[in-house]
């Protein structure tokens, strides 16, 4: 009796019809494809994109040259050089991030005690040669100045979870 059931299952292609039923269910479902450059998906305030250096409202840069971000970076993508100022505070003379090495883990952002280095929502940047993707202090400050309002909103939205 069991052999007869097995014969009819394989002869009538029951397994294949079950598979086609699943395929048919999704074949006519609405598509969820996002046509990328024209349409963009919503981003979280915690999105980790292009790095930026921030300034205080009075215009002074936030980085105190503690070098915690350089020490915590697993990819060793951050290079910092600093000097002592007349008022006995340290400030950076060089702050470079090699975006080719960076793995966008966010450790630098978490390690920073003064929220100087942050990752923005910017994900569209490019370089035509390798050196174009090494961001200097001036470039990072320019990114921070350009997106400061968005960065402040994202930091405020994320504050309860920090």
UniProtKB/Swiss-Prot annotation:
Binding site for [4Fe-4S] cluster 2: 73, 102, 105, 108
Listed PANTHER family: NADH DEHYDROGENASE [UBIQUINONE] IRON-SULFUR PROTEIN 8, MITOCHONDRIAL, NADH DEHYDROGENASE UBIQUINONE IRON-SULFUR PROTEIN 8, MITOCHONDRIAL
Keywords in alphabetical order: 4Fe-4S, Cell inner membrane, Cell membrane, Iron, Iron-sulfur, Membrane, Metal-binding, NAD, Quinone, Repeat, Translocase, Ubiquinone
Location of this chain's protein in the cell: Cell inner membrane
Gene (UniProt): nuoI
Protein name from the UniProt record: NADH-quinone oxidoreductase subunit I
Cofactor: [4Fe-4S] cluster
Listed InterPro entries: 4Fe4S_Fe-S-bd, 4Fe4S_Fe_S_CS, NADH_quinone_OxRdtase_chainI
Domain 4Fe-4S ferredoxin-type: 53-83, 93-122
Function: NDH-1 shuttles electrons from NADH, via FMN and iron-sulfur (Fe-S) centers, to quinones in the respiratory chain. The immediate electron acceptor for the enzyme in this species is believed to be ubiquinone. Couples the redox reaction to proton translocation (for every two electrons transferred, four hydrogen ions are translocated across the cytoplasmic membrane), and thus conserves the redox energy in a proton gradient.
Main subcellular location: membrane
Catalysed reactions, as listed in the record: a quinone + NADH + 5 H(+)(in) = a quinol + NAD(+) + 4 H(+)(out)
HAMAP family linked: NDH1_NuoI
Residues that, per the record, bind [4Fe-4S] cluster 1: 63, 66, 69, 112
Pfam entry (one): Fer4_7
UniProt-listed Enzyme Commission number(s): 7.1.1.-
Protein species of origin: Nitrosomonas europaea (strain ATCC 19718 / CIP 103999 / KCTC 2705 / NBRC 14298)
Cofactor note: Binds 2 [4Fe-4S] clusters per subunit.
Gene Ontology terms: biological process: aerobic respiration
Cellular component annotations (GO), alphabetically ordered: plasma membrane
Family affiliation: Belongs to the complex I 23 kDa subunit family.
Entry GO MF terms: 4 iron, 4 sulfur cluster binding; iron ion binding; NADH:ubiquinone reductase (non-electrogenic) activity; quinone binding
Membrane protein topology class: Peripheral membrane protein
Binding partners and assembly: NDH-1 is composed of 14 different subunits. Subunits NuoA, H, J, K, L, M, N constitute the membrane sector of the complex.
């Amino acid at each position: 009796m069991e052999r007869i059931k097995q014969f009819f299952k394989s002869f009538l292609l029951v397994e294949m019809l079950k598979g086609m039923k699943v395929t048919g269910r999704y074949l006519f479902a609405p598509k969820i494809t996002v046509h990328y450059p024209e349409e963009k998906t919503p981003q979280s305030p915690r999105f980790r994109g292009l790095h930026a250096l921030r300034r205080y409202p009075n215009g002074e840069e936030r980085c105190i040259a503690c070098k915690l971000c350089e020490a915590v970076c697993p990819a060793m993508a951050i290079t910092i050089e600093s000097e002592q100022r007349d008022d006995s505070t340290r400030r950076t003379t060089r702050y470079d991030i090699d975006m080719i090495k960076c793995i966008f883990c966010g450790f630098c952002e978490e390690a920073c005690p003064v929220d100087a280095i942050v990752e923005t929502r910017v994900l569209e940047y490019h370089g035509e040669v390798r050196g174009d993707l090494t961001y200097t202090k001036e470039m990072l400050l320019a990114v921070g100045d350009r997106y400061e309002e968005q960065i402040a909103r994202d930091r405020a939205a994320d504050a309860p979870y920090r």
